[in-house]
Amino acid sequence: MTEKIYPISEEIKKNTLLDEETYQKWYRESINDPESFWAKHGQCIEWFKPFTKVKNTSFNDGVSIQWYEDGITNVAYNCIDRHLKTHGDQIALIWEGDNPYHDKKITYNELYEHVCRFANLLKNHGVKKGDKVTIYLPMIPEAAYAMLACARIGAVHSVIFAGFSAEAIAGRIVDCESTFIITADHGLRGGKRINLKDNVDHAIEIAARQNVRVDQVMVIRRTCGPIDWIEGRDFWYHEEITHAKTNCPAEPMNAEDPLFILYTSGSTGKPKGVLHSTGGYLVYAAITHKYVFDYHPGEIYWCTADIGWITGHSYLVYGPLCNGATTLMFEGTPTFPDKGRFWEIVDKHKVNTLYTAPTAIRALMGAGNSFVEHSKRTSLRLLGTVGEPINPEAWEWFYHTVGNDRCPILDTWWQTETGGHMITPLPGATPLKAGSATRPFFGVQLQIIDEQGNILEGEAEGNLCIIDSWPGQMRTLYKDHERFIETYFSTYKGKYFTGDGCRRDSDGYYWITGRVDDILNVSGHRLGTAEIESALVLHPAVSEAAVVGYPHPIKGQGVYSFVTLMEGTAPSEELQKDLIKHVRKEIGSIAILDKIQFAPQLPKTRSGKIMRRILRKIAENNFDNLGDISTLAEPQVVEDLIANRQN
């Protein structure tokens, strides 16, 4: 990792919201007196009834997290209504379609009307405060309308990434007991059609077998392609939306009422329903968006994330709209119709801030510089990265080639569970280092801890923990508070364990080194190894499977599968292809097996536990650091695995 320091640019210094001195002052205040700090910044949103209590949190037995607990507000009101008097005619949402010739611009006044109609349509179909609504949509404006409409009437949304399979959708429907689904006939991505309605139909059948019945499916028309239809259950959005009223009062919501459930991979294989509440989440999404992206009114802000991920929730929809920003939503991929698409969009819409994933950056870097050089990119002021640590080579390319040495790079570290940025540079306050997430955001107290639980001071490397709460923190895992405590607070008592490894350098900068648990970070998407292993062993040819990550030049981490076949089944290229297809069907298109190694046996301890540590080293080609293998029941298994490693 490089230690070269990139100073704060003079251009940014002239017009920044926060300089180095203010950052230090505010950070000290946020740690020494969090009540006062967050009381002040809690005013960044409008409250129907002001809060009198700020912070009521404990990471000890029982774990309880409450912020602004007696305040009453509404997320949709803050994202739309409060902007109407002063800038109702400003563009709220720019939509750029998969097809480069398709786009839309929606003002705040228009957004108000769309969301009110959508909210009334939900109400007309019996959806009420507290109901769970599943959203499985492509990146179209209606996806944002659906989220905001749920927030407006107090329904809890559960958005599912449109790349997930019917089985994955069903698991989420069953867990949150959702009886109402919003989907589209198809999605469009990279010029290809995705059968969303088909997936939903299959998911509903699977959920029904687990005694969860979906009563209504709202279908948004995207392609007009043929789909199956169930009369009495399915209804067309376009047929009913024009009859819905254009005014819908915003439901008064307690700050601690749930806003959404978002499922993320768990190390046990069953996805975890991360629950975020209303007041604290919105305050944190808004304040991080404002200061991390140094947001000034009138700027065009583009977060390339899908709404199916937390980044899409916090930094495509809720944070920017709460701040009255213009946010850009992109339906397509960075490489369609060619690898210059991102830069064309930047020029076309005069984008000032581009926030994207290292995976996309590495893929575009691999395409060479000519696509970038064919564009001007003069509107760009800031560049950001999210989803995984960015390697210094990709950082340097993004900075020099895309940003022409003048746009600070905001390498943000955070999680679905944190709701918003935790470690991040601030453009006017933080000198940069390529590959470092730099310093903690306000109110974030970090500790690096070794395997024995000792707190490490100064330069150190170990497990990253957070020792006190912040407003955007998840409140629980839906219907499973015990698992919430077990997952995040049992490893180090009284501390939130992130599951990430981290290094702190001599300047106090933090470098995220990757997951230390059984979660893979593939192209910025979290996949549980247990989830993939469970999918593999469902295949009739597979007796046993173990999955680990290995360094991948584009995706950050690749998926390496060690597979033991049933007695009498021979390995073949055909079977390999079938296993890849099978896992995609079970989990979704993001679960791609990069390497499959057929192994007659897996390395196990005498008690029968698979030694994944050894498999990880083999997958990484790191044969010299296998460590102690004397505890294995059959140590010779390791030699066979090394000899047959997939290059």
Swiss-Prot record:
Main EC class of this protein? ligase
Q: Which Pfam families match?
A: ACAS_N, AMP-binding, AMP-binding_C
One cellular component (GO) term of this entry: cytosol
Query: Which residues of this UniProt protein bind ATP?
Result: 387-389, 411-416, 500, 515, 526
Could you mention a single GO BP entry for this protein? acetyl-CoA biosynthetic process from acetate
EC number of this enzyme:
6.2.1.1
Can you tell which superkingdom this protein's organism belongs to?
Bacteria
Entry keyword set:
Acetylation, ATP-binding, Ligase, Magnesium, Metal-binding, Nucleotide-binding
Q: Output the SUPFAM superfamilies linked to this UniProt entry.
A: Acetyl-CoA synthetase-like (SSF56801)
Q: Name one GO molecular function term.
A: metal ion binding
- Recount the PTM note: Acetylated. Deacetylation by the SIR2-homolog deacetylase activates the enzyme.
Reactions listed under catalytic activity: acetate + ATP + CoA = acetyl-CoA + AMP + diphosphate
Q: Which PANTHER family match?
A: ACETYL-COENZYME A SYNTHETASE (PTHR24095), ACETYL-COENZYME A SYNTHETASE 1 (PTHR24095:SF14)
What is stated as this protein's family in its record?
Answer: Belongs to the ATP-dependent AMP-binding enzyme family.
Task: State the function annotated in the UniProt record.
Answer: Catalyzes the conversion of acetate into acetyl-CoA (AcCoA), an essential intermediate at the junction of anabolic and catabolic pathways. AcsA undergoes a two-step reaction. In the first half reaction, AcsA combines acetate with ATP to form acetyl-adenylate (AcAMP) intermediate. In the second half reaction, it can then transfer the acetyl group from AcAMP to the sulfhydryl group of CoA, forming the product AcCoA.
What is the name listed in the Swiss-Prot or TrEMBL entry for this protein?
Acetyl-coenzyme A synthetase
